[in-house]
Amino acid sequence: MSASLPSLAFAGLGLMGVPMCRRLLAAGYPLAVWNRSPGKRELLAAEGAKAVEVPAELAADAEILMLCLADTAAVREVVFGAGGIVENARPGQLLVDFSSAEPAATREMAAELEARCGVRWVDAPVSGGTPGAESGSLAIMAGGRAADIERLRPVLSRLGQRLTRMGEVGAGQVTKVCNQMIVACNALVIAEVGALAERAGVDASLVAPALAGGFADSKPLQILAPQMAESRYEPVKWHVRTLLKDLDTAVKLSREQGAATPMSGLAAQLMRLHGSQGYLERDPATLVEQYRTAVE
């Protein structure tokens, strides 16, 4: 089966990367993997992937190079740093970046990679969290040449229920910024709602089912409100650190574009405050703890 499928390589085996790789392996794709910490590489090697020691080895055989990394700096290091992908990259390959990165930096890196070795870049950040990665129901927002995105569609269909081309390189990252503005502001309001319901004597565990199907309903509400009501913060499905990074990107982008985003600016400061109290690596459901102290 794998002989007729393109060979893939994947860098970044975090909360999202591992389940995404598992879906690609289950579909029969030949897959090489790299992660900074070897434990995740070994985990997927035991499931059929080829583990490599440095990112450059990913580009030796793969037709499609995939990244799912923490931030813009990590993407730049894996692609252009010592032992990076650029050392073995060649014309005809495609690089697909699932990371949430800065749009301007994405455009710059894409131009540099194509100029240096002829590899084209598609930014394809995703939304749907670990449940979406596990079930293959992610929403994928892509930026790049239309032909390149169509070439990727069969592979990406294993990972997402919807792939939308938003424009040229960088457009996917702009769309992800918009997505994260909505998600992060929503998470903060849900935390306020949960704490208020508790203090007013309402069973906060009933809020999400009571509002289901109404105008206030959302996936974040249905996921976060029950966790907050139960103070159930494990296992960590996403990180406060990630939301803060994305809000900072939103504020930076709005400044560059001359756009007003006051709610996201305030959300960034509230998220930073929460992170400074030891919650950066915790689940955003912990945001409710910020509001459980009475205001006299």
Residue ranges and their predicted role:
Residues 1-67, 98-99, 108, 130:
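NAD(P)+-binding Rossmann beta1-loop-alpha1 motif at the extreme N-terminus of oxidoreductases
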Residues 135-142, 164, 168-200, 209-223, ...:
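Active-site-proximal catalytic alpha-helix in oxidoreductases
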Residues 205-213, 265-269:
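Beta-strand segments within the central parallel beta-sheet cores of soluble alpha/beta enzyme folds
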